[in-house]
């Protein structure tokens, strides 16, 4: 007999009955609030074309490296799952067969946030009431794939059903933003913004850096092989992104290093970089200098700056060579912020025109570095628990370790940071439940009155992300 799939009404709320009752009341005030998704990686083409999603595998498995990295860790070849190769080709695998492999291994996700999110999607979005396993694989595949061909499951209809008020995608400076233009011109009222992510033309160690610079020059008409022209090209593209609705930039660097070189020093370093002769230390210094230059541009154009540092990207060389980037082989690293951010903060940390939202994969930095920095510098805010830490436990640790020094109001609420479109309501629901549980504990301990906790819960779910990202 199939096992029922049940979402308990009190999931993630405290076990203690009195505290749980408080958490229920807090959650009830936030559960139906509109979703603010100020940072993520959904594909704007979905909303531009409003074409049906192909099938269960292409929508829920292939884009989700949270899921297939776990399967890979247990010996499942990515070809069995239909994951594209670096050159765009794929192994000849039937999507149904790939789904069967996934379903047969779904138990590997027990206790993980991926299981929480996916079970929410299955239950709430697709109205499935039995658990996914080998026996239910075909039922799931047929049910989901059939639903995806109906108007109610088109991207725009789901956007509206999910009560998304605004969502931001993330694009390279080389992107023409044609999909965002199509959305704006279509008459659809859904709000889909972009964000400026210049890593491809900032990181000398990126495998496509040289070709990206050539495209950067062709797109902007600037002499990007000279430091002043390179900076002008960034300003031009940032203005283009802002005109298309962007309110933020995003920077994914190996570290949080910043620098403040003189123009002459920066030009000499840049000359070395564009000749392809930069050492690892020089590449790091170049990224550091560009971050400070991006901050200077944010002071001028008002774009909110996000920094996502501290990840060793593509740790598995064989996997990277075969499948390319973003295939589940990224590993958190220890990250310094106190020394790394000082050159940038010396220039802009007190400037009311500047806003920097910093994330971390190094939880040891929360209470030692990031919360004290955000609790002091007016320009600095803390991004929520990110990536490897957006599990309920990670969200709880984030609150515990940052509250004393940064409070709630030097944080920015929640952002889902996902490619998995259908999981967005689930991710926000988890965050709202965890915050309700955390606040309920403070009320039960008489550290907050319930009316204060209610206001904070609404701020974290809705007001703070709108405010932080200028939405």
From Swiss-Prot:
InterPro entries: Metal_Hydrolase, Uronate_isomerase. Pathway: Carbohydrate metabolism; pentose and glucuronate interconversion. Gene3D superfamilies: Metal-dependent hydrolases, uronate isomerase, domain 2, chain A. Keywords: Isomerase. The keyword Isomerase applies. GO terms for biological process: D-galacturonate catabolic process; D-glucuronate catabolic process. Belongs to the metallo-dependent hydrolases superfamily. Uronate isomerase family. This is Uronate isomerase. It comes from Xanthomonas campestris pv. campestris (strain ATCC 33913 / DSM 3586 / NCPPB 528 / LMG 568 / P 25).
